[in-house]
Amino acid sequence: VLDRSFVTQPQLPECNDDGNDENKPFLVKPDALLVNLKALRFVTRNDSGRVLVSVEPPIASIRIDNQVKVSNAKQCTGDVRYNPVTAADGSVTVTVSGQLAEGCSSQTYLSLLDHATYTAGAVRAIWQELGGTIQGRDIQAPVPKDAKVLARAFSPDLAEIIRDINKYSNNTMAQQLFLSLGAQFRNDADGDDAKAAQRVVRQWLAKKGITSPHLVMENGSGLSRAERVSAREMAEMLQAAWRSPYAAEYISSLPIAGTDGTMRKRLKTTAMRGEAHVKTGTLNTVRAIAGFSRDNNGNTWAVVAILNDTKPWGASSVLDQVLLDLYRQPKLAAAAPVL
C-alpha cells in the first residue's frame, strides 16, 4: 500500500530549464513517498573484455538493452550513451550504446519512473535482495487503520537536510522541505501545502520585522520562473539568520568558496578560498550568489548579487569579482595600545 496523502500537492507550471531532457534527476518533483530522490544509477564497465551494465536499485520495470562494444582504445573516452524508451505498460527499456575500453567504466543518473512505481519497485527489489518476497499488487491508498507498524525510520535533522540542499543546490529537497513546512501548518483556507508554506514564511518574516513586497514564492526552490526576491530583501533575511541562535548551523550549510559544494571550483586559487560561505543560483538567464563573506580586516558581510541576462556568459566571474573586491578592503591601521 503506497500512501501519498501526507502532502497536498499544488498545481504548478513546469520549469523547463533542462534542454528538453525530462529525465534529468534535478527535475524530480517532491512527493510524500520520495525515495532516494527517485534516481536510478546506471553503471557500465568493461571487465576483462566483457561489457556489463547494471542499474541501482534493480527495479523490475527497468530493462537494459546492452549494445556497448569493446574498444581497443588505450584511454577511457566516456563514449557511452543511455537512451530510455517507455512502453505502454509503463516499463522502461534503456538502450546503452557506445564503446568502452578495457578497465574503463561509465555511469549516469536518470529519473525514469513515477514516484509510486519507483518506490514500490525499490522496496520490492531491496526486500528480494534480503531474501524476502512480497505477494500481491501495488495499490495507492491511505494506510489501513488496522495496519501494524513493523519498522519505523526517521529523517536526518533539519541542520543536516539544509546542508545537502544548500551545498549541492538540490531543488528536489528544497521543494520537499517547503511542502513539508506547509503540511505541518496547513489550515483549511490554504488549499494546498505550497500556499500553506508561503503563508508560514511570510508570517515568520513579519515576526522578524522584514518587509518583503518584492518576494514571490512558488515552489520553494530555485527551479522556478515565477519566484522573485530583491537583493535587499535577501540581505535582510541573511542578517536575521546571522542573529539567530541557529546561525552556526545555517552558515555551515552554505558552500565554502574554493572548497566544497557548488563553490568548490570557484575562487580556488585566490585569497578568497575559505573566506566565504555562499549559496549559488543558476538558471538559463540568471546567475546569483547569497551568503556571508569576510573582508581583509576580518569583518563578515551579508552579500547578495543577482544578474539577469538573456546571455549570462561570464556572469559567474563577475559575481566572483564582487566577493574579491569586498575582500580587498583597505587594511585598517592597528589601534594604539591602551595603557
Predicted segments, located by residue:
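Conserved serine DD-peptidase/penicillin-binding transpeptidase domain
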Residues: V1-S212, N296, R328-K331, A335-L339
